[in-house]
C-alpha cells in the first residue's frame, strides 16, 4: 500500500491553485489515503454477476420544454447583491495572478 506524500498533496494543491499550510497538507494527505483505502476495498468486490447500469433508479420524463420568458427585474436583482458595477455583480478577487 502506497502512502500519499506531502509532495503529492502539494502538487495537487498547486494544480488546484490552493495554498495549504503544513497542518492542512497533513490533513489532506490523511483524508486522501482514507479515500484510496476505501477505493481499494471497493476494487476487491466481485461484480461479475451485477448488471451494468447508469442509474440507481429509472428516471422518466425529467426534462421539460424550454420556455422563453421576459425578465424585467434585472435592476431589482442587482439591488439584492452586496456590491455592483454598472449592470453586473461585483465580487472580491479570489485568485492570485
From Swiss-Prot:
Coiled coil: none
One annotated GO molecular function: glutaminyl-tRNA synthase (glutamine-hydrolyzing) activity
Protein keywords: ATP-binding, Ligase, Nucleotide-binding, Protein biosynthesis
Domain of life: Bacteria
GO biological process, any: regulation of translational fidelity
Its EC number(s): 6.3.5.-
Catalytic activity from the UniProt record: L-glutamyl-tRNA(Gln) + L-glutamine + ATP + H2O = L-glutaminyl-tRNA(Gln) + L-glutamate + ADP + phosphate + H(+); L-aspartyl-tRNA(Asn) + L-glutamine + ATP + H2O = L-asparaginyl-tRNA(Asn) + L-glutamate + ADP + phosphate + 2 H(+)
A Pfam family annotated for this UniProt entry: GatC
Top-tier EC class: ligase
Record HAMAP family: GatC
Role according to the record: Allows the formation of correctly charged Asn-tRNA(Asn) or Gln-tRNA(Gln) through the transamidation of misacylated Asp-tRNA(Asn) or Glu-tRNA(Gln) in organisms which lack either or both of asparaginyl-tRNA or glutaminyl-tRNA synthetases. The reaction takes place in the presence of glutamine and ATP through an activated phospho-Asp-tRNA(Asn) or phospho-Glu-tRNA(Gln).
Family indicated by similarity: Belongs to the GatC family.
Record note on quaternary structure: Heterotrimer of A, B and C subunits.
The protein's name: Aspartyl/glutamyl-tRNA(Asn/Gln) amidotransferase subunit C
Organism for this UniProt entry: Prochlorococcus marinus (strain AS9601)
Amino acid at each position: 500500500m502506497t502512502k500519499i506524500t506531502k509532495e503529492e498533496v502539494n502538487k495537487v494543491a498547486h494544480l488546484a491553485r490552493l495554498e495549504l499550510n503544513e497542518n492542512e497538507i497533513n490533513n489532506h494527505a490523511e483524508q486522501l489515503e482514507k479515500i484510496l483505502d476505501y477505493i481499494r476495498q471497493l476494487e476487491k468486490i466481485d461484480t461479475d454477476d451485477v448488471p451494468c447500469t447508469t442509474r440507481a433508479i429509472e428516471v422518466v420524463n425529467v426534462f421539460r420544454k424550454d420556455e422563453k420568458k421576459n425578465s424585467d427585474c434585472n435592476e431589482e436583482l442587482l439591488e439584492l447583491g452586496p456590491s455592483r458595477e454598472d449592470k453586473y455583480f461585483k465580487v472580491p478577487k479570489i485568485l492570485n495572478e
